[in-house]
A protein has these predicted regions:
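N-terminal secretory signal peptides and thylakoid transit peptides that target proteins
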Residues: 1-20
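Hydrophobic membrane-targeting signal helices
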Residues: 22-26
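Beta-strand-dominated extracellular/periplasmic modules and repeats
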Residues: 27-184, 191-207
Length: 207
C-alpha cells in the first residue's frame, strides 16, 4: 500500500519544527556530560596561591605537568574565568599544611589557576604518592580538584592515573576520572616530565 503523501509531509514538517526548536533552545545532538564528583577529603586548605608551579625544585618525586580545559555542559564551550583549585599528597604520601606532614611551606603541592579565553589551565608538580588506608590498602595516586565558575555549579572531584595497581578495589574511583600518563621526550636537555590531561565539565546553575 503506497505511503500517504499527506502523512509523509506532516511527518517531515513535524521533524523540521522539532529541529528548529532544538536549535533555538541550545539543544545539541552531541552531549557534553558533566564531570563526575568525588569526595573532597579532609586535607583541603582554602586560599592557595595562584601559580603554575606548585612543586618547588627541591620537592622529591617524578615531575608531572597537568593540563586541561574547563567546559560548560550546556554546549561544551570553554569557560573563561573559572578557578581550578588543586591539592595532592607528596611522594611520601603526606599532605603539606597538615600536622605531622613536615616541611616549612604549607602551600607545597597546592595551588589555583584562573582560566583564560580557551578555558585552559596548567599545573607543574610531581606525581602524587600513595598513602595507607589500613594495614593492607593504599589509596591510588590522585589529585584533588575544586572547580568554580560564577554561572556554574561548583565541582569537587579527583583525578586518577591509568595503570595504578591500586585503582582496582578502591570504592571512590570512577572510570571517567582516570586519565593516561604520558612520558613525552624531553627537548633541549630539559628534565624528563610526565604529562596528563584532564578536562573538567561543569553543570550550569540554570538549565
Amino acid at each position: 500500500m503506497p505511503d500517504d503523501p499527506t502523512l509523509t509531509r506532516r511527518g517531515f514538517l513535524t521533524g523540521l519544527v522539532a529541529a528548529v526548536f532544538a536549535a533555538a533552545h541550545g539543544v545539541e545532538a552531541a552531549s557534553c556530560p558533566p564531570t563526575e564528583d568525588n569526595p573532597q577529603g579532609p586535607f583541603y586548605v582554602s586560599g592557595a596561591p595562584f601559580r603554575v608551579g606548585i612543586a618547588p625544585d627541591d620537592e622529591p618525586g617524578e615531575r608531572l605537568v597537568v593540563t586541561g580545559r574547563v567546559l560548560s555542559a550546556t554546549d561544551c564551550r570553554p569557560l573563561p574565568g573559572a578557578v581550578v583549585d588543586v591539592w595532592h599528597a607528596s611522594d611520601a604520601g603526606a599532605y603539606y599544611g597538615m600536622e605531622g606532614a613536615g616541611g616549612d611551606d604549607a602551600w607545597r603541592l597546592r595551588g589555583r589557576a584562573s582560566t583564560g579565553p580557551t578555558g585552559a589551565y596548567r599545573f607543574e608538580t610531581i606525581l602524587p604518592g600513595r598513602y595507607p588506608l589500613g594495614p593492607r590498602r593504599l589509596r591510588p595516586r590522585h589529585i584533588h580538584y575544586l572547580v568554580t565558575h560564577p554561572a556554574h555549579r561548583p565541582l569537587v572531584t579527583q583525578l586518577y592515573f591509568a595503570g595504578d595497581p591500586f585503582l582496582e578495589g578502591d570504592g571512590l574511583v570512577r572510570r571517567s576520572l582516570i586519565v593516561p600518563l604520558a612520558s613525552p621526550p624531553a627537548a633541549g636537555g630539559a628534565p624528563k616530565r610526565l604529562a596528563a590531561t584532564f578536562d573538567v565539565v561543569l553543570s550550569p546553575l540554570k538549565q
